UniProtKB/Swiss-Prot annotation:
Cofactor(s) for this UniProt protein: pyridoxal 5'-phosphate
Lineage of source species: Bacteria, Pseudomonadati, Pseudomonadota, Betaproteobacteria, Burkholderiales
This protein's pathway: Porphyrin-containing compound metabolism; protoporphyrin-IX biosynthesis; 5-aminolevulinate from L-glutamyl-tRNA(Glu): step 2/2; Porphyrin-containing compound metabolism; chlorophyll biosynthesis
Record carries keyword GTP-binding: no
CDD domains registered for this protein in UniProt: OAT_like
Protein known as: Glutamate-1-semialdehyde 2,1-aminomutase
Length: 436
């Protein structure tokens, strides 16, 4: 690929952009090789700088639930752009989007719009601390909540240890109040609350951890987490940047509410789908908590581009489309057909593979033994066969299927993916496995 336009663009990019990319996973460091520079997209497809077409299962890391260039979204964005790109003042459209989000999320009474998932998670964390008057927070190893300093933490040794920074440039003092636990571990959770319950402001969790590829929080674990937060006066914060309006119309929290009577988080963080591909995110919760935010309360949060009129037009059009009858049933069926086909192809080739899906989100792993179950936490994800995944990724890429270039990232199906696209993907999988 040395003489390709992708390669020359990457070489050029590395001279002016650190690592040649503006977000690390795009550099293909995890899988090796040359990243694809995308020239255009339409429906379920991407075209790279060399003109090669790919069936897209990244979907801009989740936002493109309708596919690329959906007519209703294009029309809304084009109209909004002619009216003005940014005002730094309130608009009717941001009120409409807030109302639409609240209609779909029963746990929330108010919502604040921001520009990125990192900003939303950081703001929700500050709000939780301000509302409770406490400092300590709990997160889980393998869950990603953006790159705010307090959340860039990995676990130390033991069941419940205060975190150590994952990134250089984050002082240890910044994360001394961050407690890192093992996902799906009830024993560790109970130990943490037993030792620190009166000091914990909030627990932040990805209900389906899409930054461990695809790992669900089990029902007993989630039920106990809700009980402990209530018992100790800590807020339960659902990070639904990835799962919100993606795995179900009401997000992952609606799935837990069906299985656990009365279940709801105290605060929710959204992004990706609510922006439809534009920079937009939000955090939401009960009025009594949300009104702790400035200008009403003492918790400060602000943003020049928050509620941007073009982004809100894109998000509003997207949310209205996904509410149409049968949308999620069709999306979930296509995702299930894809995952079942991938698993069947692997079984037929004698290759161990496990996977899971919900709504339009899926993930799969290559365990090192045929008897392995789905991973339940970060350590178990790390124990899967990364080298086999890398070979599979490149085999699929060569055959025109664009999967996430990292073992730890979920995949996404859109409404634009057709049965023919899925069958073409499965044919590529069979050929890739046969060539391995």
């Amino acid at each position: 690929m040395a003489d390709s336009r992708n390669a020359s663009l990457f070489e050029r990019a590395r001279r002016s952009i650190p690592g040649g990319v503006n977000s690390p996973v795009r550099a293909f460091r995890a899988v090796g090789g040359t990243p694809r520079f995308i020239a255009r997209a339409d429906g379920a497809y991407l075209w790279d700088a060399d003109g090669k077409r790919y069936i897209d299962y990244i979907g801009s890391w989740g936002p493109m639930i309708l596919g690329h260039g959906h007519p209703a979204v294009l029309e809304a964005v084009q109209k909004a752009a002619t009216e003005g790109f940014s005002f730094g003042a309130p608009t009717e459209r941001e009120v409409e989007l807030a109302e639409e989000i609240l209609k779909l999320v029963p746990s929330a009474e108010q919502v604040r719009l921001v520009s990125s998932g990192t900003e939303a998670a950081m703001s929700a964390l500050r709000l939780a601390r301000g509302a409770t008057g406490r400092s300590k927070i709990v997160k889980f190893e393998g869950c990603y909540h953006g790159h705010a300093d307090a959340l860039l933490v990995k676990a130390g040794s033991g069941l419940a240890t205060f975190g150590h920074p994952t990134s250089a440039g984050v002082p240890t003092e910044v994360v001394q109040h961050t407690l890192v636990l093992t996902y799906n571990d009830v024993t560790g959770l109970e130990a943490a609350f037993s030792a620190h319950g009166a000091e914990i402001a909030c627990v932040m969790i990805e209900p389906i951890a899409g930054n461990m590829n695809f790992v669900r929080a089990g029902l007993p674990f989630m039920k106990r987490l809700r009980e402990l937060c209530t018992q100790h006066g800590a807020l339960l914060v659902f990070d639904e940047v990835m799962t919100g309006f993606r795995v179900a119309l009401g997000g992952a929290q609606s799935l837990y509410a069906k299985a656990i009577p009365g279940f709801k988080p105290d605060l929710s963080v959204f992004g990706k789908v609510i922006g439809g591909g534009m920079p937009l995110a939000a955090f939401a919760g009960p009025r009594a908590i949300m009104e702790q935010l400035a200008p009403l309360g003492p918790v400060y949060q602000a943003g020049t581009l928050s509620g941007n009129p073009v982004a809100t037009a894109c998000g509003l059009a997207t949310l209205r489309e996904i509410q149409k009858p049968g949308f999620f049933e069709s999306l979930a069926a296509g995702t299930r057909d894809l995952l079942d086909g991938l698993l069947h192809a692997a079984t037929a080739a004698g290759v161990p593979m496990v996977g899971d899906c919900e709504g339009g989100m899926f993930g799969f792993f290559f365990p090192k033994t045929a008897q392995a179950a789905l991973p339940q936490n970060y350590v178990e994800v790390m124990a899967t066969d990364g080298e086999r995944f890398n070979r599979y990724f490149h085999g699929m890429l060569d055959r025109g299927v664009y999967l996430a270039p990292a073992l730890y990232e979920a995949g996404f199906v859109s409404a634009a993916h057709t049965p023919a696209d899925i069958e073409a993907t499965l044919a590529a999988a069979r050929a890739t496995l046969a060539a391995a």
